[in-house]
Amino acid sequence: MNKVNKVNYIIEELENLFPKVPVPLNHKDPYTLLIAVLLSAQCTDERVNQITPILFKKADNPYDMIKLSVEEIKEIIKPCGLSPMKSKGIYGLSKIIIEKHNGYVPKTFEHLEELPAVGHKTASVVMSQAFGIPAFPVDTHIHRLMYRWGLSNGSSVVQTEKDAKRLFPEKKWNKLHLQIIYYARKYSPARGWNIDNDIICLLYTSDAADDLRC
């Protein structure tokens, strides 16, 4: 199976397995998605979804958020980890969104990545899932599977993103990155991985073992 056929097979299999892929983080608009994604750094989606209702009950927009102190935000989000850094980031980005963007989350990578505590991955999630702009956020699951499938060399998430964008059609990026995450969690985890449960790798081992790292 050459790389083109492999990519086409992955796309088809993921579409069969996960025709609908909701964003795992609960949110209602670009701002609440931005905050949820920021909180998800080194924290499970499940934990984030437990914390955001508490936070958003007090402040679900930048204007209400800056009425809270950094310390108040920190106490609410403490179960998510990294609360000192995240609370300063949430307060700081809320202030900038008000002062520079009229209270709206900006719609460009440049302006998103200027916000405190917002890196390229967070910006990519917001661009793709809040605004529908093609992006390919790479988290640990996508980084692992791109390497495991022999589609990237695993050298860095930057390289993995470049390879994903080069190999997969742009019109599929926004859905596909979520499908890969869902697949990774269910069939191809980092720990306790069993090839007998890994549908995609199972096909490769009999067909394309030379460029597979399963």
Regions found by a protein language model. Give the residues of each.
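Single conserved hydrophobic/aromatic residue that forms the stacking wall/gate
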Residues: 204-214
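Catalytic cores of DNA base-excision repair glycosylases
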Residues: 2-206
